[in-house]
Every structure is written in structure tokens, then in C-alpha cells.
Amino acid sequence: MKLKYSNCFVIIGFFFTTFFLGSVFVVASYGVMNQNLLQSTTGGSLEVNITTSPEVIAPNKEVKFKINFLEPDTDKIQVHVDYDFQVLKNGEEVFSAAKQINQPLLHTAEGSVTIPFMFSSPGSYSIKIPVLGINFIPINPEYAEFKFVIN
């Protein structure tokens, strides 16, 4: 009798796992970014956290990227960061927030910024955030990069 119920639990567990994992893969393929992306810069000087609004990213619809610069291994906002916000499609830059205002870089005094962007077509994209200075002190360029697909 125990064996019969054990098999039942295994089968039910298999179906639930398949259902939920299948849902995750379907959602990911439609341009949903993880709503709490956190990555260290290549040199480890900062951690970069990105959230999106709306959650589902679609072509020809504006999405707002909220970027928080954090001190490494903490939840503390790092103030006075020199950076850029770049969008790359298939490895080629299609947008640079700094170039939009004819500047080599941007500066956030608060350590947090929201940047709107509209993807014009489906494809493989990266959000690249180069960091060039912290607290008014230039650093060797570092970056955080987040990759995703828009369908």
C-alpha cells in the first residue's frame, strides 16, 4: 500500500514540476525580465540592481529601467556615480543615454536613476551599464551587463 501512494506522490510531483518549469520558460521567452536583477561590475567596485516597469517587456512599448548603484555586498546605495546606460542588440549599440545628451557620461548624485526606453523590434538585447567614476573619483572603466530576449 505504501508503494502505491509513493508512486502517486512522485507522479503528482512530476506534473507540478513540469507545469511550473514550463511556465517559467514560456514567461522568459516573452520578454519578462527578472524583477530584481543584481550584478557586480566587472571590477567589483559596485553592484548594480535593475528593475523594470512594466514587468513584461514588449516591442514598441515604453519600459522604465530603475537602476540602483549599491556598495558591494550591502544594500546601501552608492551616491555620486558616473555611468552610462547602453542598449545593445546582437552586440551592437542601439542606444546610449549619455550620447542622447551629447555627453561622455552621466552622473547620479542619489545613486538611483530611472531611464525610459522603447525597444523597436524583437531580438536579443543587452543592457550594459559602464561605470567610470565613484564619489567624483575616476576609476578604470567597469560595467555590469544584463542579457535578455524580446519577442
Name what the model sees in each region:
Residues 1-32, 67:
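Secretory targeting signatures
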